[in-house]
C-alpha cells in the first residue's frame, strides 16, 4: 500500500493498470512493476522518491538514457517503466509501452530544439553540469558538493555483486557523472581491497597521464595574472592538484573537463580489468544448438561490454555477429526478419526456438490453434477433384514418374540422397511430423517460456485433452486453455505419459482400447467392420508397408469428446489414434512448468563430476535395484541416460528393518566431496521447551520429501549411477536423478530452503498460527478452537499439495500425545519418548555408544543423568564389535541412571511473560547438572555438563564453562539469557576473576548455598616471599632413549638430581617442581624455565588426569605460601644455568649426536644445506657445516663450494625462463622458496628493473643473485639496485648449480602451469595461478609450511631475533642497586640478568638473587667509577 499511496493516486493507478506491456499483448502494468523499479533505482543510488512526480521521472530518464546502448535488459526494462510512469503523471493518453517511448522521444526532440534556440539567442555555449558534485550557489559561485555516502555504498555493492564483470563499466559511468578527480579517487579508494585490479588501474592511469604530458607540453615562461596553470597528467589524476584547482579547470571558460578526462582513463583501466576477469572474445560467443536465444543474447552483450572498441564497432558487431553466430534455427528466423530488426523483435521471434523441445512445441502450437483438421491433415480423399502433377524422383522433372524415366539412374537413395541403399530400403521415415507451415497458420507463434525458466516437473509430464463440454476442472489446464483461446477457458482430462497413453474409444457402436499417438498422421484400427464405402490404401509403418481399408467421415468418441474423420482399418498390432483426430478434440502434448523453482548447483571450482566404478552386486540385489529403479523411472524421479554421460556413482541395496523389502542406497561420498558447499539454512533442531503453550496442535509429515523437489537440470548428469548385470551379460542400465537424491549433501539445504519459500505465503496469511519446520516434520500450533484449527490444517495441506508436497494421513497426528522430533508432546507438558535401557551381560563398543546416546537424549528432562564413567570405557581406537567389561564406577553410574529413568518426568512450555532461571549443582568428578525453569519445580528443561577442555582444570573454570554453555543454549531456544543461581561465593569468584577476567565472562548471577560449594584450594603469591628458600628447577630427557633427569639448586646451596625412565622433557620439568615442593618448607619460591609447567600451575587446577600434576596439586594445598616465577633458558642466569648443567649431564649432550646419523643419511639423499639440517635434526651449526664439508658432491676443488646456497632472509634469485614463445621472469626467495613471477614483453633491462622495483616494494630485498644475462647486467638494473639499496651478485658462468634454487623453481613452475593451463586463456593468467598454487597450496619443507607461510615466518622471526638481541645487549648496559629484606641501606651495583614483570634477576659478585621490582633501582652504566654507595641518588637515569 505504501507504493500505491506515494507514487500514484487512485485515478492514476487505474490509468496505470490499463496500459499494456507490449502492443497487442495481454499483460498489463501492475503495482509490482513500480515496486521493482524503485528497488532497481536504489541499486543505482538514485532516489526512488523521484518516481512520485513527472519531473522526477524526467530526471531519472535523463540519467538512464546514456547507458541504454551498452546497458543490460534490466536497464532497458527500467527505462521503459519510468517512461510509462512519466506519461501517467503527465496525463498523456497511451495504450502500451511503445506509445510511451514515442511520446518521450517527441518531447525530447521538442526540448532539444528549444534548448538549441535558447543557446543561439544567448550565445552562451558553455554548459555547466547540473549533476553533482559541482553546483552553482545563490551568489553564482561554483561550489563543490562532496560525493554522497549513498553513491559510494552503491559503488561498493556493484563491485561486490558484479566482481568486475562488464556491467561494472556502465554502472561506474552512471555513478560518477560530473565527478571531480578527488571524488573519483574516493570511489577507487573505497574498493582498494581489490589490490590486483587496483594495481592494473594504477598502471593504466600512469600510462595515460604520461601520454597527456607528452601531448600537452608545459608552455615556457610565467603564467599571466588571473590565468590558471594548465593541468599535468598527475593533476588530472588528482595527486598533485587541489580540489579548488580541479573546480577551476572544470568551470573555466573554456573549461578543461579534468573529471571527464580522468573518468575516461579509469574506464580504460576498467576495460582491461574486465578483460582479465572475463577473458572471452566476442568472436567466441556462439549460440549452442540447444541454448535459448535469450541466454545467447545475454552472453553476447555481456562480452560485448567487455570489448575494447568504439561504439561504432560495437554497433557493427551487434548487427552482424549476433545473427552470424546464432544457431541454424534462430539464424533462419533472424534473416527472415531483415537487417533493420530491433533486438525486441528478434527476442520475440526466437522465443522458444532451439533445442529438442522446439519441434514438439511447434506441433503442439499447430494442434492447439487449428480448428479445421482438413486444412492440415491432408487425406487423399479430401482432394479427390484436385489434380496434382507427379514429379520424377530420378531427374526431378514433372509429368512422369521414376519408373518411366529415360534419363540414366541417379546414384544412391532417391529419398535421402545417401549412397549404399535404394529408396525402398530407406530407414528415414517421412511421417511429415513437422511441417514448418503448421505452426504459423494463424499468424505469429505463441510465446513459449525460455528453457531456463521451464523445469520439467517429474510428476507432471502429461497429455491433455480439452473441449468445451467437460465438467472436470484442472487449474493448470484452465490457465493453459485460456492462453490458447483468449476468451473461453477449457477443462482438461490429463493422461500421464509415464505409461503408454491407452484410452477407451467408441466407434461403430463398439468399445475398443486405443493408443493416443501424437507421432502418427493417421488413425489405424485393427480389423473390424465399419459402415459405408471404403477404398484400398497402402501405409508405411515401423514394420514395413501394410494394406488397409480407408473409411471417410466416421464418427468416433474419444474420452467423451466426439470427432469425425478418416479411419484406416487393417492388421495393426495396436489401435492408434493419430493426429487427424487428436487435433479435432484439442489434444496437446504438455510439459507443464514445475511450480518449485530449481536451485542452481555447481561443483567446486576446478573439479569434475565423480567417476567411481560400480562394484559387483549379487543377483538378488540387482533384481531389487531394477525393480526399484523401474518404479522410480515411472514416477519421474530418475531418467535413463546413454553412454555420453561419463560420470558414475556406486549403487547398492540393503534390506529394510524387519522387512523382506529392499532399499536402494547410492554412495554419494565422492560427489559430496566435489559439490559446492551449502549454507545450512537450519543450524539445529527446534526444542519443545521453547514452544509456547497452544490450545490446538497438529503434527504433519511430508511424504517423499526430497523426491518432491526438482534437481538443477545442469547438475543432474553428475548423479549418474549404473545397475550392473550378472556376469556382464549386458551393459549396465544407466540412470540419473531428476529430483533431490537421498544422501547427497545439497538435499537438506535445498529442501529446507524450498519448504520455507512454500510456507512463507501461508505464514503471512495466518500470522497467529505457529509452524515449526524441521526437514519433513511440521508442528502446527494455534489458539483457535479445534474445528477452526483443523480447517486451517486442511488449507495448509492443500497449499502444500498444490506445490507437489503430500502429507500422508497415516502420519497426520490430530490428537495428543503428539510424537515429534523424538519428543512426546501433551497439551500442557512435554517429555522425551519412552527410553528403555537394555539389560546385557556383555557390552560391545557399539552398545555403549548407543547407551550414551540414549542417556544424553534423556538428560534434557531427567535431572542428574551422568555418563562420564561410561564414556571413559570408549577411550582409544576400538572396533565397534569389541566387547568392553564395565568398570565398577561405570556399573554404579548405569544403575543410578536406571533409577532416575524409572519415574517419568515431564517439562512445561515456555511463558514469554516470565523470567528464565537456571540452577546449577556440582555432582563431583567434573560433572555438573542444571535445571532451567520459570516457576519452582516446573522445569522447562534440564541438562548436564561434563566437558573438560583441558587435562588440568578446577571447579571455578568448569563452572564458568557450564554457565557459558547454558547461556548459549538459552539464546538459541528462547532468544534471551536466564538468571543464574550458582554454588559459589562472591569472594571466591572475585579472586578467580581478577586473574582470569579476560578469558571468561558470565552473565548476571547470585549465590545459592547448595552443597558442595565451589572453592579455590590454594593460591599463588604475586611477589617473591621474603626469607623463603628459592629453588631453581629444571629437567631434561632424551627423545630416543626416554631417559631423563630432574633436579633443583637452591639459594642456600642445596641441590638434588633424580634419574627418570620412560619420560619426556615436559614430565621432567613437572617432576623437578614436585621435588622442590616435597623438599621445601611451608613457604617457597620456585624459579622454572618451562612455560609448559608454569601454564599448568598458574591456572590453579584442583584436579587433573595426570597423576604427576595431581601429586603437585596435593603438595600445593599443603603449603602456606608459594611463589612461582619463570626465567628464559640458556641466558646465563646463575641458578638456572647451574641446575641446567646439573640435569643435562649425560642427557642433553647426546641429543644432537643421535641426530648426526639421520642428518648424514638425509644429506646423502637430498644434499640439503647446513641450515636445513640444523633445523630438522637439532644439530649445532658447526656439526651441520661439517657434514656438508665432508660430502664429495658438495665439494669443488677440494673445499666447500663457493656456490653453497646462502639462506639469509633478504636473498632472492632471479632468472628468465621461456614457455610458449613468451618470457617469464621468476624471482625466488631462497630461504623460503616463495615465488614472484610475471610474463614480460621483452627480455630487456628496462622490464627487469621495473619487475625488480615491484619486488622490492613488496618484500625486504637485500641481495639479488642472477646469471650473467644481458638484461641482468644492464645499467638500468644496476641503477634500480643502487636506488633500492640492493646488492647484486652474479652466478658462476656455465655452472647452473650457482642458480640452483631458481632453476629448480622454473621447472616446478612450468609443471604447475601445465596442470592449470587449460583453465586459463592467456599464459599470463596461468602463470599467476601457478604462482598462487606454489606459494599457498603446496606445503612441505622446513616447518611443514607453504612457501607463503614460510616467508612471513622467516621475516617475522628475523625481526624478533634482532629486537631480542638489542634487548639483551641493552640489558647488559644497566646496573642495579637494591635493598635486602628490611635493611635500609642500598647495595650494589649488581649486574642485571633479567627483568620480569614483578621481579628482576641480578648477580651480585657470585650470588644470583631474585629481587622484587619495588626494591630495586636500575640505572644505565656510563662507564664511570662511582664514588660510593651513598652517591647513588635519584639524579641518575632510572628505568
Curated annotation (Swiss-Prot):
Identify the stretch(es) annotated as Dimerization of protease.
493-497, 541-547, 580-592
Lineage here is: Viruses, Riboviria, Pararnavirae, Artverviricota, Revtraviricetes
Tell me the segments the record calls region Interaction with host CALM1: 8-43
Region described as Dimerization/Multimerization of capsid protein p24: spans on this chain: 277-363
Q: Give the start-end ranges of region Interaction with host AP3D1.
A: 12-19
Organism equals: Human immunodeficiency virus type 1 group M subtype B (isolate JRCSF)
Q: Could you say which residue ranges form the zinc fingers (Integrase-type)?
A: 1154-1195
* Marked site positions, Cleavage: 132-133, 363-364, 377-378, 432-433, 440-441, 492-493, 591-592, 1031-1032, 1151-1152
Regulation (activators, inhibitors): Protease: The viral protease is inhibited by many synthetic protease inhibitors (PIs), such as amprenavir, atazanavir, indinavir, loprinavir, nelfinavir, ritonavir and saquinavir. Use of protease inhibitors in tritherapy regimens permit more ambitious therapeutic strategies. Reverse transcriptase/ribonuclease H: RT can be inhibited either by nucleoside RT inhibitors (NRTIs) or by non nucleoside RT inhibitors (NNRTIs).
Domain Reverse transcriptase span(s) in chain numbering: 635-825
Q: Where do the segments described as Interaction with Gp41 lie?
A: 7-31
**Leftover remarks:** HIV-1 lineages are divided in three main groups, M (for Major), O (for Outlier), and N (for New, or Non-M, Non-O). The vast majority of strains found worldwide belong to the group M. Group O seems to be endemic to and largely confined to Cameroon and neighboring countries in West Central Africa, where these viruses represent a small minority of HIV-1 strains. The group N is represented by a limited number of isolates from Cameroonian persons. The group M is further subdivided in 9 clades or subtypes (A to D, F to H, J and K). Resistance to inhibitors associated with mutations are observed both in viral protease and in reverse transcriptase. Most of the time, single mutations confer only a modest reduction in drug susceptibility. Combination of several mutations is usually required to develop a high-level drug resistance. These mutations are predominantly found in clade B viruses and not in other genotypes. They are listed in the clade B representative isolate HXB2 (AC P04585).
Q: Where is this region: Interaction with membrane phosphatidylinositol 4,5-bisphosphate?
A: 73-77
Gene of this entry: gag-pol
- Write down the Pfam families for this protein, in alphabetical order: Gag_p17, Gag_p24_C, IN_DBD_C, Integrase_Zn, RNase_H, rve, RVP, RVT_1
| DNA-binding residue intervals | 1374-1421
Residues annotated as binding Mg(2+) 3 are 1215, 1267, 1303
**What's the protein called, per UniProt?**
Gag-Pol polyprotein
Q: Any keyword Cell division?
A: no
Which residue intervals define the domain Peptidase A2 in the entry? 512-581
Recorded hits in PROSITE patterns, A to Z, give:
ASP_PROT_RETROV (PS50175), ASP_PROTEASE (PS00141), INTEGRASE (PS50994), INTEGRASE_DBD (PS51027), RNASE_H_1 (PS50879), RT_POL (PS50878), ZF_CCHC (PS50158), ZF_INTEGRASE (PS50876)
Amino acid at each position: 500500500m505504501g507504493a500505491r499511496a506515494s507514487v500514484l493516486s487512485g485515478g492514476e493507478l487505474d490509468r496505470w493498470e490499463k496500459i499494456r506491456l507490449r502492443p497487442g499483448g495481454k499483460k498489463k502494468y501492475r503495482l509490482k512493476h513500480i515496486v521493482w523499479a524503485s528497488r532497481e533505482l536504489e541499486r543505482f543510488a538514485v532516489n526512488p522518491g523521484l518516481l512520485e512526480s513527472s519531473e522526477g521521472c524526467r530526471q531519472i530518464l535523463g540519467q538512464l538514457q546514456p547507458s541504454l546502448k551498452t546497458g543490460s535488459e534490466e536497464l532497458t526494462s527500467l527505462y521503459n517503466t519510468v517512461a510509462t510512469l512519466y506519461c501517467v503523471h503527465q496525463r498523456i493518453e497511451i495504450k502500451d509501452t511503445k506509445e510511451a517511448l514515442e511520446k518521450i522521444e517527441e518531447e525530447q526532440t521538442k526540448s532539444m530544439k528549444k534548448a538549441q534556440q535558447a543557446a543561439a539567442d544567448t550565445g552562451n555555449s558553455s554548459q555547466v553540469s547540473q549533476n553533482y558534485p559541482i553546483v552553482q550557489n545563490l551568489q553564482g559561485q561554483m561550489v563543490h558538493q562532496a560525493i554522497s555516502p549513498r553513491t559510494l555504498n552503491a559503488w561498493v555493492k556493484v563491485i561486490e555483486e558484479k566482481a568486475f564483470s562488464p556491467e561494472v563499466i556502465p554502472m561506474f559511468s552512471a555513478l560518477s557523472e560530473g565527478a571531480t578527480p578527488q571524488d573519483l579517487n574516493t570511489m577507487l579508494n573505497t574498493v582498494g581491497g581489490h589490490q590486483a585490479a587496483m594495481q592494473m588501474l594504477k598502471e593504466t592511469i600512469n600510462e595515460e597521464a604520461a601520454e597527456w604530458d607528452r601531448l600537452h607540453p608545459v608552455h615556457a615562461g610565467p603564467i599571466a595574472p588571473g590565468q590558471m596553470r594548465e593541468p599535468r597528467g598527475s593533476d588530472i589524476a588528482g595527486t598533485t592538484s587541489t580540489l579548488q584547482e580541479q573546480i577551476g579547470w572544470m568551470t573555466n571558460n573554456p573549461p578543461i573537463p579534468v573529471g571527464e578526462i580522468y573518468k575516461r582513463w579509469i574506464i580504460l583501466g576498467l576495460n582491461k580489468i574486465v578483460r582479465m576477469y572475463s577473458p572471452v572474445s566476442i568472436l567466441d560467443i556462439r549460440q549452442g544448438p540447444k541454448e535459448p536465444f535469450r541466454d545467447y543474447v545475454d552472453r553476447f552483450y555481456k562480452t560485448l561490454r567487455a570489448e575494447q572498441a568504439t561504439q561504432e564497432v560495437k554497433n557493427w558487431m551487434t548487427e552482424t555477429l549476433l545473427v552470424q553466430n546464432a544457431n541454424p534455427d534462430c539464424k533462419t528466423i533472424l534473416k527472415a526478419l531483415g537487417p533493420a530488426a530491433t533486438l525486441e523483435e528478434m527476442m520475440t521471434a526466437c522465443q522458444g526456438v532451439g533445442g529438442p523441445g522446439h519441434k514438439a512445441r511447434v506441433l503442439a502450437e499447430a494442434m492447439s490453434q487449428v480448428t479445421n483438421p482438413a486444412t492440415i491433415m491432408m487425406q487423399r480423399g479430401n482432394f479427390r477433384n484436385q489434380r496434382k502433377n507427379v514429379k520424377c524422383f530420378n531427374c526431378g522433372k514433372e509429368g512422369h514418374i521414376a519408373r518411366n524415366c529415360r534419363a540414366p539412374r541417379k546414384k544412391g537413395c532417391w529419398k535421402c540422397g545417401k549412397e549404399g541403399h535404394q529408396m525402398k530400403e530407406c530407414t528415414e521415415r517421412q511421417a511429415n511430423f513437422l511441417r514448418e507451415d503448421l505452426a504459423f497458420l494463424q499468424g505469429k507463434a505463441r510465446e513459449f517460456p525460455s528453457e531456463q525458466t521451464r523445469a520439467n516437473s517429474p510428476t507432471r509430464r502429461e497429455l491433455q485433452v480439452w473441449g468445451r463440454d467437460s465438467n472436470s476442472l484442472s487449474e493448470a489446464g484452465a490457465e493453459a486453455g485460456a492462453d490458447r483461446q483468449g476468451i473461453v477457458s477449457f477443462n482438461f482430462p490429463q493422461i500421464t505419459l509415464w505409461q503408454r497413453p491407452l484410452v477407451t474409444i467408441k466407434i461403430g457402436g463398439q468399445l475398443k482400447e486405443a493408443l493416443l499417438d501424437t507421432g502418427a498422421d493417421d488413425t489405424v484400427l485393427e480389423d473390424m467392420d465399419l459402415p459405408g464405402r471404403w477404398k484400398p490404401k497402402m501405409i508405411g509403418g515401423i514394420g514395413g508397408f501394410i494394406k488397409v481399408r480407408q473409411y471417410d467421415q466416421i464418427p468416433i468418441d474419444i474420452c467423451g469428446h466426439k470427432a469425425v474423420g478418416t479411419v484406416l482399418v487393417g492388421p495393426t498390432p495396436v489401435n492408434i489414434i493419430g493426429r487427424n483426430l487428436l487435433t479435432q478434440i484439442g489434444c496437446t502434448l504438455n510439459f507443464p512448468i514445475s511450480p518449485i523453482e530449481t536451485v542452481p548447483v555447481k561443483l567446486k571450482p576446478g573439479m569434475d563430476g565423480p567417476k567411481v566404478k560400480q562394484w559387483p552386486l549379487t543377483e538378488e540385489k540387482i533384481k531389487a535395484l531394477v525393480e526399484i529403479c523401474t518404479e522410480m523411472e515411472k514416477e519421474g524421479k530418475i531418467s535413463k541416460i546413454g553412454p555420453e554421460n561419463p560420470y558414475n556413482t556406486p549403487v547398492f541395496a540393503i534390506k529394510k528393518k524387519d522387512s523382506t523389502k529392499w532399499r536402494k542406497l547410492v554412495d554419494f561420498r565422492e560427489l559430496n566431496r566435489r559439490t559446492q558447499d551449502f549454507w545450512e539454512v537450519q543450524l539445529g533442531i527446534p526444542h519443545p521447551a521453547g514452544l509456547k503453550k497452544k490450545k490446538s496442535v497438529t503434527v504433519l509429515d511430508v511424504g517423499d520429501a526430497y523426491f518432491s523437489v526438482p534437481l538443477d537440470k545442469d547438475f543432474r548428469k553428475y548423479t549418474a549411477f549404473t545397475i550392473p548385470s550378472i556376469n556382464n551379460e549386458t551393459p549396465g542400465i544407466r540412470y540419473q536423478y531428476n529430483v533431490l537424491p537421498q544422501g547427497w549433501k545439497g538435499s537438506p539445504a535445498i529442501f529446507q530452503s524450498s519448504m520455507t519459500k512454500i510456507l512463507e505465503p501461508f505464514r503471512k496469511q495466518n500470522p497467529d498460527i505457529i509452524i515449526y519446520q524441521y526437514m519433513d516434520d511440521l508442528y502446527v500450533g494455534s489458539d483457535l478452537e479445534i474445528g477452526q484449527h483443523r480447517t486451517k490444517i486442511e488449507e495448509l495441506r492443500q497449499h502444500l499439495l498444490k506445490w507437489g508436497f503430500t502429507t500422508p494421513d497415516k502420519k497426520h497426528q490430530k490428537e495428543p500425545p503428539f510424537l515429534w522430533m523424538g519428543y512426546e508432546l501433551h497439551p500442557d507438558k512435554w517429555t522425551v519418548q519412552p527410553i528403555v535401557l537394555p539389560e546385557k551381560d556383555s557390552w560391545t563398543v557399539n552398545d555403549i555408544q548407543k547407551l550414551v546416546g540414549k542417556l544424553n537424549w534423556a538428560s534434557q528432562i531427567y535431572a542428574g543423568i551422568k555418563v562420564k564413567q561410561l564414556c571413559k570405557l570408549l577411550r582409544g581406537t576400538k572396533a565397534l564389535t569389541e566387547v568392553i567389561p564395565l568398570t565398577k564406577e561405570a556399573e554404579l553410574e548405569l544403575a543410578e541412571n536406571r533409577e532416575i529413568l524409572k519415574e517419568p518426568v515431564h517439562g512445561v512450555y515456555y511463558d514469554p511473560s516470565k523470567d528464565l532461571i537456571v540452577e546449577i549443582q556440582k555432582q563431583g568428578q567434573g560433572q555438573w547438572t542444571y535445571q532451567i525453569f520459570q516457576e519452582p519445580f516446573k522445569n522447562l528443561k534440564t541438562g548436564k555438563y561434563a566437558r573438560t577442555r583441558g587435562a588440568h582444570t578446577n571447579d571455578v573454570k568448569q563452572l564458568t564453562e557450564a554457565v557459558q554453555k547454558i547461556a548459549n543454549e538459552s539464546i538459541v531456544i528462547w532468544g534471551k539469557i536466564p538468571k543464574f543461581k550458582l554454588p559459589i561465593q562472591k569472594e571466591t569468584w572475585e579472586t578467580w576473576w581478577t586473574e582470569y577476567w579476560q578469558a571468561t565472562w558470565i552473565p548476571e548471577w547470585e549465590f545459592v548455598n547448595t552443597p558442595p560449594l565451589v572453592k579455590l584450594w590454594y593460591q599463588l603469591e604475586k611477589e617473591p616471599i621474603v626469607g623463603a628458600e628459592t629453588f631453581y628447577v629444571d629437567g631434561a630427557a632424551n627423545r630416543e632413549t626416554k631417559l631423563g633427569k630432574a633436579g633443583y639448586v637452591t639459594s642456600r646451596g642445596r641441590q638434588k638430581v633424580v634419574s627418570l625412565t620412560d619420560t619426556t622433557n615436559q614430565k621432567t620439568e613437572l617432576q623437578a617442581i614436585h621435588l622442590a615442593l616435597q623438599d621445601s618448607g611451608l613457604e617457597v619460591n620456585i624459579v622454572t624455565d618451562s612455560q609448559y609447567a608454569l601454564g599448568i600451575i598458574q591456572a590453579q587446577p584442583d584436579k587433573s588426569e595426570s597423576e604427576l600434576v595431581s601429586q603437585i596439586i596435593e603438595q600445593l594445598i599443603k603449603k602456606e605460601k608459594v611463589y612461582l616465577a619463570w626465567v628464559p633458558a640458556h641466558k646465563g642466569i646463575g641458578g638456572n644455568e647451574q641446575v641446567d648443567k646439573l640435569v643435562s649431564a649425560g642427557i642433553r649432550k647426546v641429543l644432537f649426536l643421535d641426530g648426526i646419523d639421520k642428518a648424514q643419511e638425509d644429506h646423502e639423499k637430498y644434499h640439503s644445506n647446513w641450515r636445513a639440517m640444523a633445523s630438522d635434526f637439532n644439530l649445532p651449526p658447526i656439526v651441520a657445516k661439517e657434514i656438508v664439508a665432508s660430502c664429495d658432491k658438495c665439494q669443488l676443488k677440494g673445499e666447500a663450494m663457493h656456490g653453497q646456497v646462502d639462506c639469509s632472509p633478504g636473498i632472492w634469485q632471479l632468472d628468465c625462463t621461456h614457455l610458449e614463445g613468451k618470457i617469464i621472469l621468476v624471482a625466488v626467495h631462497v630461504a623460503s622458496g616463495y615465488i614472484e613471477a610475471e610474463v614480460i614483453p621483452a627480455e630487456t633491462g628496462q622490464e627487469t628493473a621495473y619487475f625488480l622495483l615491484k619486488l622490492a616494494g613488496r618484500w625486504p630485498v637485500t641481495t639479488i643473485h642472477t646469471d650473467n644475462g644481458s638484461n641482468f647486467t644492464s645499467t638500468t638494473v644496476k641503477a634500480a639496485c643502487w636506488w633500492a639499496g640492493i646488492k647484486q651478485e652474479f652466478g658462476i658462468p656455465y655452472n647452473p648449480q650457482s642458480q640452483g634454487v631458481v632453476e629448480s623453481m622454473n621447472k616446478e613452475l612450468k609443471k604447475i602451469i601445465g596442470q592449470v593451463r587449460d583453465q586459463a586463456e592467456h599464459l599470463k593468467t596461468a602463470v599467476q595461478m601457478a604462482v598462487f598454487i606454489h606459494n599457498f597450496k603446496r606445503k612441505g619443507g622446513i616447518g611443514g609450511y607453504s612457501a607463503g607461510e614460510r616467508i612471513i615466518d622467516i621475516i617475522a622471526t628475523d625481526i624478533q631475533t634482532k629486537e631480542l638481541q638489542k634487548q639483551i645487549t641493552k640489558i647488559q648496559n644497566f646496573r642495579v642497586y637494591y635493598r635486602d629484606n628490611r635493611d635500609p641501606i642500598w647495595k650494589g651495583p649488581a649486574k642485571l640478568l633479567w627483568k620480569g614483570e614483578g621481579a628482576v634477576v641480578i648477580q651480585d659478585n657470585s650470588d644470583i638473587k631474585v629481587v622484587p621490582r619495588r626494591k630495586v633501582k636500575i640505572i644505565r652504566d656510563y662507564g664511570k667509577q662511582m664514588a660510593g654507595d651513598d652517591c647513588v641518588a635519584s639524579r641518575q637515569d632510572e628505568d
